[in-house]
């Protein structure tokens, strides 16, 4: 096996729903990554039990346990699937060891990355942030509109099955809205962004649904729709269950109160309705909100590994 074919080792912090799904995705799908460690704090968690059964090295002593693992030096990339508060401590502990970090929490310590929009912009950073599930689903649409015409205001509503929201998601609700709103502006290109999350208690659970509302001025409506459709196709390359739920709507703002959400001159409202069905690698298909996060993080981790490999070869 040559250096160009040896998988790069990663560690996953957080043995909950997101961390476990990410582990299984890497094991099943990736040819360039290898799970060198699954890190948790609950020795009885299902994620650590599954990792043990699959032959993945584990520790239930958190980041301190990871640092003590015999293969720690060989780990190149650490993916953090804990919580916003925990990530700050994890980053502080690991930074001295020069490990690259992919943050799946709303902590937003490092620059935002949405693979279909700005993959190459931040890969050199030692810590990148995957925004939120709602951000990964909707920011590409805002960016697609921004590529054609300025977006004065963009609002997203992410509706996810309550059953798919674990303790970490529920603890991070405030950070979810703040981080997603900032990323709508910084990555999506909107002058003003707003984010809303809904935990839908319906039974049986419904798959993730997302609505994007954008206020724009005069523009080529066909070009806007074409840009959106192309972006949906780009996201679907790494999240196969990502799709338009219904036709794209562009309506004049005459008499619509949403026109008061911005002081800028706007003439039309763009409405985009999406749904995200999960791949059901570990979680049920309705948990598209978690699937889009782990799929996007896998995409970024593989890009980081490829970047490091190309640098080593050069």
From Swiss-Prot:
GO terms for molecular function: acetaldehyde dehydrogenase (acetylating) activity; NAD binding. The active site is at residue 133. Its EC number is 1.2.1.10. Pfam families: AcetDehyd-dimer (PF09290). NAD(+) binds at residues 15-18, 164-172, 289. GO terms for biological process: catabolic process. It catalyses: acetaldehyde + NAD(+) + CoA = acetyl-CoA + NADH + H(+). The keyword Membrane does not apply. Keywords: Aromatic hydrocarbons catabolism, NAD, Oxidoreductase. Transmembrane segments: none annotated. Belongs to the acetaldehyde dehydrogenase family. This is Acetaldehyde dehydrogenase 2. It comes from Nocardioides sp. (strain ATCC BAA-499 / JS614).
